[in-house]
Every structure is written in C-alpha cells, then in structure tokens.
Amino acid sequence: MLDEKSSNTASVVVLCTAPDEATAQDLAAKVLAEKLAACATLIPGATSLYYWEGKLEQEYEVQMILKTTVSHQQALLECLKSHHPYQTPELLVLPVTHGDTDYLSWLNASLR
C-alpha cells in the first residue's frame, strides 16, 4: 500500500448524485472523455432525504463515485456543476490517504 502525499498527484474521491442513470452515464462519459476523472462508479437505487426550501424531500438517485487527483479536482467539480441538471448538486471531495500503488499509478496515468 502507498501513503498518499499532500501534492497535486494525491488522489481524491468525488461524490455526486444524479437524478437517473442516463444523466449519471452522460456526466461520467463527459468527465472521462475530458480526462478529469480516471474512473466513475455509478450506483443506482440510492435514496436521498433532505430539506429543500423548507420541505422534506425524498428522491431516488444514482450515486456517482469519481476518482481523480487534487490537481484535477477543481476542473472536475466545475465540469460536473456546469453540466448537472440540479441547481445545487452534491459535490463532495474526500481525500485518499492510502491506496494500492499500481491502482494509484494507473489513476494518475489516466488523467490529462
């Protein structure tokens, strides 16, 4: 295993939800084509509960898990936000503190 360093090649995981599989696949295809993410995992069937404008909402969504680097995260977030149908999409960045050396090397090589 490799300890990730605090650098531009450090890996991060970006979480984003989409309203349906078609939207999630379109967003994933866009960020992969632009080499802003190395991998997108789409998990349909997520249920999100939240308050929006004072009302409790419940939505069935697709959870997107995107793998990228610190140096690509801002461009990835901007791309997702500009192409996302939600007014305020879920965009969360989680640091990767450990990972398999071969996987992290592949991740870095897969990005622009």
UniProtKB/Swiss-Prot annotation:
Which keywords label this protein? Answer: Copper, Cytoplasm, Metal-binding
Its GO CC terms? cytoplasm; protein-containing complex
Fetch the InterPro entries from UniProt: CutA_Enterobact (IPR023700), Ion_tolerance_CutA (IPR004323), N-reg_PII-like_a/b (IPR011322), N-reg_PII/ATP_PRibTrfase_C (IPR015867)
One GO MF annotation is: metal ion binding
Q: Does the keyword Phosphoprotein apply?
A: no
Q: How is the cofactor bound?
A: Binds 1 copper ion per subunit.
Cofactors (names)? Cu cation
Q: Which superkingdom does the taxonomy of this entry point to?
A: Bacteria
The compartments listed are: Cytoplasm
Q: What does this protein do?
A: Involved in resistance toward heavy metals.
Task: Provide the family line.
Answer: Belongs to the CutA family.
This protein is called what?
A: Divalent-cation tolerance protein CutA
Q: Which organism is it from?
A: Escherichia coli (strain K12)
